[in-house]
Design a protein with these regions (language model features):
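Membrane engagement elements in two modes
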Residues: 2-4, 10, 14-177, 181-190, ...
Length: 245
């Protein structure tokens, strides 16, 4: 009896040890894949992005701009009319001149990755993407936004319930202090923070920021400087997860 019990305990211990090793191995693999994705995005950011042919299913349904202080914030509503979630699609913004020539404003090779690419957008959903250009549009120019069809990095969407908590206070007119909290086990690289305000259906202020690394279970603060003036309008601020695998 004793020898049988010892064998049973030994077998159970082996199973637990194997399960622990498997969990550790899986966790290590997940971490490695996330780092590989971040590296792929960093490499893609070093290439110029110019979308010339629009995606027929994932489209920019609204393109608004807010100008002030020598800058222009693009606030783009993107709708995913396809049957699948999508992520890492290229997006180009700029303006068209009266003669029809397009000027691209986010085609540089020194931008953060998500200043020329979209975070995840799920099937049938719409989301807002914000980009700030260090230039005001010339008179008569018409803003445009084009979403591409081919993802720039091989991201997976297997952890779709990731949510980043945030609180914010306006420390002075046009300046917002934001506190971020990642309560999940999924670290966020190049996390996107978007802020925008509307009045009577028109955007009157906007800003965006990239948080390079918000680790699992960690907190971080940042300051946003708005383009335009919110002037008491309701300011909406979103922290958009970029690692969902």
């Amino acid at each position: 009896m004793h020898s049988v019990r010892r064998r049973g305990l030994g077998a159970a211990a082996l199973v637990l040890a194997a399960a622990g090793l498997l969990a550790g191995c899986t966790s290590t693999q997940h971490a490695a894949k996330r780092m590989q994705l971040d590296s792929a995005r960093e490499r893609a950011a070093q290439l110029s992005t110019r979308v010339t042919s629009a995606n027929p299913l994932i489209t920019a349904t609204r393109v608004a701009t807010v100008s002030g202080g020598g800058a222009t914030a693009f606030v783009v509503t993107v709708h995913n009319g396809s049957r699948r979630a999508a992520t890492d699609l290229p997006i180009s913004v700029g303006y068209s001149l009266p003669g029809g020539r397009r000027v691209y404003l986010n085609a540089g090779t020194t931008l953060n990755y998500f200043e020329a690419h979209l975070p995840a957008i799920f099937s049938g959903r719409s989301s807002v993407w914000v980009y700030t250009a260090n230039a005001e549009l010339p008179r008569g120019a018409r803003p445009f936004a084009l979403v591409g069809s081919k993802p720039a990095a091989p991201a997976l969407l297997t952890e779709t319930n990731v949510r980043i908590r945030l609180t914010w206070t306006e420390v002075r007119a046009g300046t917002v202090r934001i506190k971020l909290d990642n309560p999940t086990s999924v670290p966020q690289y190049q996390l996107q923070v978007y802020a925008y305000a509307q009045r009577s259906g028109h955007y009157i202020a906007a800003a965006n920021a990239t948080v390079v690394d918000l680790g699992a279970g960690s907190k971080q603060s940042l300051t946003l400087h708005l383009v335009g003036e919110a002037d008491g309008a309701r300011l909406q601020i979103e922290a958009i997860p970029t690692i969902l695998q």
